[in-house]
Amino acid sequence: DMLCFMLMMLTLFRLIIWYKESSYKNTIFLAIVTGLSVMTKTTGALLAFPIMFIFLFKFISEWKKIKNKKTIKKYLRIFTLFGLISLPIGLWYNIRNLILFKQPIMYILEIPNELCYTGNVSLFYRLNLFSKELLDPFALTDRDVNIPAYVLKSSLFGEWSWNYFGIYKILYFIVIFCNILLTIYTFVSIFQCLFRKKQDNKLYLWMLLFLFIFNVVSFLGMNIKLPYGFSMDFRYLLTLLPIGAIFVYANIESIIKNNKYLGNYIYGMVNFLTTILLIFTNLIIFTSII
């Protein structure tokens, strides 16, 4: 999960470089890191959507400037080169298993019903944003069934139980509250950034939104197909963390340009909540280990 996450972030970085200079060298670098991301874990295939978006946008932009066959040929060569490099690197193992064992390329191991099975609970309850499970301290695969609550809790404490008595109960409440506030403001920032008339780097923000949406859709689809406690873990949504942070600070930057005092106040509050969240979360974990 961590290696795939790193390679996905590197792919987005190389994609931005490619957009600024769509040379063959940058195409090769982009294709290699994309292929490695997919090879590490099929979740890396989510990058196909933002890559497709940027490729098409770049081609259309160039076509509007220079409407001739050379432009078409140039980008056909670039897209072909990207596919010839990235697809073999990303799918060689899946194709090997398909040939040797007739295993489908997108195969997911079927798991028999166990204690952590959540398919016997209605989807409405599992997606309820106001679940009582938030009142429980930690995410447990054999007990929890609500997806939003599980994501919030596992993003802080993983799938383990830590100290929960005395002062720890207060710290836990503060940490969860900070996490909820930051999550809400992240969605507010996404909305404001995308619908603000004058917003810097809007193209890249749309690219990140594509990855954000498809990651969430893929995550929900997995939880419907594989309704188990461990399917709800935040590790399957790791890309949302840097994407959300980019939207938050891009929004704050735009607010500062229009209202310096308001922007600085929001900036201070976001940093304060993040700092409190990090300090208290690590305090709970480290003191539990000790």
Question: What spans do the regions from the language model cover?
Answer:
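Perimembrane helix-loop-helix junctions
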Residues: 14-17, 47-84, 100
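Signature aromatic-anchored transmembrane alpha helix within multi-pass, membrane-resident enzymes
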Residues: 32, 52, 79-87, 252-290
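Hydrophobic alpha-helical membrane-interfacial segments at the cytosolic entry of transmembrane helices
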Residues: 32-33, 67-94, 112-117, 208-210, ...
